[in-house]
Amino acid sequence: MFELKTVALFVVTAIAEIVGCYLPYLWLRQSGSIWLLLPAALSLALFAWLLSLHPEASGRVYAAYGGIYVAVALGWLWLVDGIKPTNWDVAGVVFTFIGMGIIMFAPRA
């Protein structure tokens, strides 16, 4: 159960990070309102706070989180940008999940 909570927290964290970066992109590249920067800053603050909720050392958390981030970013690519991930994209996610699993679940001395 702990692992499922951890992965769910990583997913929410990734969404907060992506939204926090996507909104300034809309402002800078898509002629969005400068007011998009306010929710972007709040989203990035939420992202940082969510990362602090994990009991592991921060470097390990960031490394393991990276695997979930890659998967969520490809989901964003598909759902928001309307671009279907390629088989190579999916293979990349599988490899990042393998690395994430090793980092998260390896025995600790």
UniProtKB/Swiss-Prot annotation:
Protein known as: UPF0060 membrane protein HEAR0108
Keywords: Cell inner membrane, Cell membrane, Membrane, Transmembrane, Transmembrane helix
Subcellular location: Cell inner membrane
Record PANTHER family: UPF0060 MEMBRANE PROTEIN YNFA
Membrane topology value: Multi-pass membrane protein
Family: Belongs to the UPF0060 family.
Taxonomic lineage: Bacteria, Pseudomonadati, Pseudomonadota, Betaproteobacteria, Burkholderiales
Top-level taxon of the source organism: Bacteria
Membrane-spanning ranges: 7-27, 33-53, 63-83, 87-107
Family matches, as InterPro entries: UPF0060
Annotated source species: Herminiimonas arsenicoxydans
